[in-house]
From Swiss-Prot:
One of its GO terms (biological process) is response to antibiotic. It is found in: Cell membrane. It is a multi-pass membrane protein. The lineage of its organism: Bacteria, Bacillati, Bacillota, Clostridia, Thermoanaerobacterales. This is Undecaprenyl-diphosphatase. InterPro entries: UppP (IPR003824). The keyword Hydrolase applies. It catalyses: di-trans,octa-cis-undecaprenyl diphosphate + H2O = di-trans,octa-cis-undecaprenyl phosphate + phosphate + H(+). Pfam families: BacA. One of its GO terms (molecular function) is undecaprenyl-diphosphatase activity.
Length: 261
């Protein structure tokens, strides 16, 4: 992968990690559509480390407050939220650890991704349309956190979207849009860190070239901007724009996949 392709993939990762459109799907589809060298799961996760930097920089005050409160137990709303995030991370860690090889070898077919983009777009639409607007971030309870955490485990499949499925689940549990987005982003921090660390330990040092560095840096900068955009957007609008994008992209991918055979 040359430096230009590394930058493009960094932009793709930064834009799509936090928007409910599936970053893993885009990291498979962009090389497939434009003839780039396929980066593989290791480079995918390395780009996720760039977006990890983005979410840590954006939410550092939140994490500082939550960690401090969590270290003192569950006597405060922030303390409870911290431990809810910890527990909600576990399903994604377990599923990712045991199913990584299956996903890498069998669940990255463009046709399947196209179908899942459309299906999960429908789920996001229905959840946002019929979900309540009752709970704020600190109103989230243990059952809400576990439901969101279990749904996050499905995001290992390209086309599902980690942010999409977690925000949809939160909306179904009555969490308002802005709070659903913030919880989703906070929940992404440990899962991205863990997945990235696991893959980095296996990674060939020869992959640490200019393209790799440019991709990670670009994904960090663009990811930060994507977080800012989504939080601003959902404060005033629904998720419909992302639903429309998912359906159109999914249909396009299905048509191209069928034409290519």
């Amino acid at each position: 992968m040359n430096p230009f392709e590394g930058i493009v993939m960094g932009i793709v990762q930064g834009l799509t990690e936090f928007l409910p459109v599936s970053s893993s799907a885009h990291l498979v589809l962009v090389p497939w559509l434009f003839g780039f060298e396929t980066p593989g799961l290791v480079f995918d996760v390395a780009l996720h480390l760039g977006t990890l930097v983005a979410v840590l920089v954006y939410f550092w005050r939140d994490w500082l407050r939550l960690v401090q409160a969590g270290s003192r137990g569950v006597g405060t709303a922030d303390g409870r939220l911290f431990w809810f995030l910890v527990v909600a991370t576990i399903p994604g860690v377990v599923v990712g650890y045991f199913l990584e090889d299956i996903v890498e070898t069998t669940l990255r077919a463009p046709l399947l991704i196209g179908v899942l983009l459309i299906m999960m777009g429908g789920v996001l639409y229905l959840a946002d349309r019929y979900g309540g607007q009752v709970k704020r971030l600190l109103d989230i309870r243990f059952g809400d956190a576990m439901a969101i955490g279990l749904s996050q485990a499905l995001a290992i499949i390209p086309g599902v979207s980690r942010s999409g499925i977690t925000m949809a689940t939160a909306r179904l549990r009555g969490v308002e849009r802005a709070a659903a987005a913030r919880f989703s982003f906070l929940l992404s921090t440990p899962i991205i860190f863990g997945a990235g660390l696991m893959q980095m330990l296996k990674m060939d040092p020869g992959l640490l070239n200019l393209s790799f560095v440019l991709g990670v840096f670009t994904s960090a900068v663009v990811g930060f901007l994507a977080i800012w955009f989504l939080i601003s957007w959902v404060s005033r609008h629904s998720f419909n724009i992302f639903v429309i994008y998912r359906v159109l992209l999914g249909l396009t991918v299905i048509v191209i996949a069928l034409l290519r055979g």
